[in-house]
């Protein structure tokens, strides 16, 4: 499944292609591009940290690796993602990256635990309200996508005709 977009990966995994086509044609494509590629607000690489946090909590190895790869591509370094994969939420990151990861993990683990103190911590490290919204959206989108990836079944591989 290397190099597949999230909608393609879900289509690849599903045992009900009609459902996956609906999913990929509509909701995910619109949300994915609106949330991850929108101009302004949080940087693309920081949105990827939010998605990595969600994918780690949900144990979606495929998605975590895709987001890590994208983060490394955007920043031209795999230092941050290597630290995250080695030490999880305790990774020694910049204050801003650490706060982004911590919040995305908390939001993914137990959404109702996210509170004013978390928002204040994000503001303390320099995030504005628009960036915080982008973080909530990117983390939530991939928390949802991770859950779908886990339950749609095993990958459907094309059969080879040996005639």
Each predicted region: which residue ranges?
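Hydrophobic alpha-helical segments
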Residues: 1-163
